[in-house]
Amino acid sequence: MATYNKIADWAVNSEKTANIGTDTFVLALSNTAPGSESTPPTGDGNGVLANVTQVSYTNCSSRTLTTASSSQTSGTLKLDFNDITLTASGGSVGPFRYIYIYDDTPTSPADPLGGYYDYGSSTTLSAGETL
């Protein structure tokens, strides 16, 4: 089972640069542990996609998320996305262990990270396989 981890910078970025209702959110795949990146994306001020080593997406289906609903209660933002299926086509995708959610719309900071899922071990999607 995957474990969700919030990126601390998202609290600041979501308030200052994100428009939850209209922005485009995308998944990014990585096989590099956040703490092993040359600039860890979990560090203060580093929560952007540029600090994540991504896998090649040549054989991967669309990674764009569709917002199902969002709400805010007592300072807690809840953002729900429709289910998404990633499919490898024409070759493999990965290996990857971490799946980041980032906001693809803001330009400053560009591509702020909301959080990531840690699957506990690396996986590779072979052609025709889905996640």
Residue ranges, per PLM feature:
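Small cysteine-rich, disulfide-bonded extracellular modules of the LU/uPAR three-finger superfamily
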Residues: 1-97, 104-131
